[in-house]
Amino acid sequence: MIDFKKLKIIYNKIELNDIQNHFKTIDKSIVIKQLENCSFCWKEVEIYFNDCHRVLEVKTRNITVNFYFQNKKDIPPRAKILLTLKQILTVIDYFKIQTNFLFHVILYNGTRTLPQKNEVLSPEHINGGFTSLHQSQIFILRHEEFSKTMIHEVLHHCSALHNENYTTNQINSLKQNFTLKDCRLRYNLYHLLST
């Protein structure tokens, strides 16, 4: 059970003054060259990402966020970025998550859509982001709801909430019932069911 009073106390104690001076634009080649063989991405995201040449880097405590953009107008308002970081820090502090996170936020404008009749469910229908529990990198693939997706991906790193020990029978049942293309989409299904 979540203690909302404790959550509010943590939230109110977090100061964002240190973040204000840690916004800087850098060259993309310094950060990451490309999304190679990404099974969670789709063609349009890769095209958008490859056309991004600049990155807005924002740092605080144990979080670095890189916003990949084509035009400065694509960058979310500073107030929204600060609020998102405060919310993420609240979750990290509340659940005592010890990870140093590196976010790659690709500001692709495509929206989620449901598959057409007889179309197989795929990442472009579900994914807003992804992470690996064994790494500290989190990828956010859509401008749409980026802040909610960032928080959602951090929650995957909370051992009290996330369990990746699906049995083979559970995975096969989910794949059959939801017409999933392959087993890599089990995390996508988790996203679909939890949002």
Annotated model-derived regions:
Residues 1-24:
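Intrinsically disordered, low-structural-confidence terminal and linker regions
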Residues 27-136, 143:
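Auxiliary, metal-adjacent structural segments of Zn-dependent hydrolase domains
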Residues 71-78, 140-149, 181-192:
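Short, charged/polar micro-motifs that form catalytic or ligand-binding hotspots
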Residues 83, 87, 149-153, 193:
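Acidic, Ser/Thr-rich intrinsically disordered and amphipathic helical segments
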Residues 103-105, 152, 156, 174-180:
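Structural signal for hydrophobic/aromatic residues that build the beta-strand cores
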Residues 113-115, 158-159, 166-168:
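Short catalytic/ligand-binding loop motif for oxyanion handling, primarily in non-cytosolic enzymes
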Residues 148-163:
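Active-site recognition of the HExxH zinc-binding catalytic motif
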Residues 162-163, 167-195:
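Post-HExxH zinc-binding segment in Zn-dependent metallohydrolases
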